[in-house]
């Protein structure tokens, strides 16, 4: 049951990713997905391996963050409301 929760934690941000227009929000979702993957991996394998993997993810996300800050300076943060409701409804249906 715990494995199913972690897998849904990895799937939910993928559905939510299509509703975001801001690259910074996408980086935040990437961080959430990597954190869920590391927690899941830490529960089934060595916690040291999961910790090192998380540090590598954070390093990659920092490089992406710097790149996005240089390229796109003035994006407006916003959500597409109808797609968000559709994807949240799909995730709730999957979880029930």
Swiss-Prot record:
Annotated family: Belongs to the complex I subunit 6 family.
A GO cellular component entry from the record = mitochondrial membrane
Please state what the protein is called. Answer: NADH-ubiquinone oxidoreductase chain 6
Q: Where is the signal peptide?
A: none
Enzyme Commission number: 7.1.1.2
Q: Which UniProt keywords apply?
A: Electron transport, Membrane, Mitochondrion, NAD, Respiratory chain, Translocase, Transmembrane, Transmembrane helix, Transport, Ubiquinone
Species of origin reads Albinaria turrita
Q: Which domain of life is it from?
A: Eukaryota
Q: What is this protein for, i.e. what is its function?
A: Core subunit of the mitochondrial membrane respiratory chain NADH dehydrogenase (Complex I) that is believed to belong to the minimal assembly required for catalysis. Complex I functions in the transfer of electrons from NADH to the respiratory chain. The immediate electron acceptor for the enzyme is believed to be ubiquinone.
| Transmembrane stretches, start-end | 24-44, 48-68
Query: Would the keyword NAD be found if you checked this record's keyword annotation?
Result: yes
Where's it found, cell-wise? Mitochondrion membrane
* Top enzyme class: translocase
A single MF term (Gene Ontology): NADH dehydrogenase (ubiquinone) activity
How does the entry describe its membrane topology? Multi-pass membrane protein
The reactions it catalyses are: a ubiquinone + NADH + 5 H(+)(in) = a ubiquinol + NAD(+) + 4 H(+)(out)
Does Transport count among this protein's keywords? yes
Gene that produces this protein: ND6
């Amino acid at each position: 049951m715990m494995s199913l929760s972690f897998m849904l934690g990895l799937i939910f941000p993928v559905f939510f990713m299509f509703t975001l227009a801001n690259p910074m929000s996408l980086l935040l979702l990437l961080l959430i997905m990597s954190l869920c993957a590391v927690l899941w991996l830490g529960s089934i394998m060595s916690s040291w391996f999961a910790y090192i993997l998380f540090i590598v993810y954070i390093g990659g996300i920092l490089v992406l963050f710097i790149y996005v800050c240089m390229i796109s300076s003035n994006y407006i943060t916003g959500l597409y409301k109808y797609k968000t409701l559709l994807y949240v409804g799909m995730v709730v249906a999957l979880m029930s």
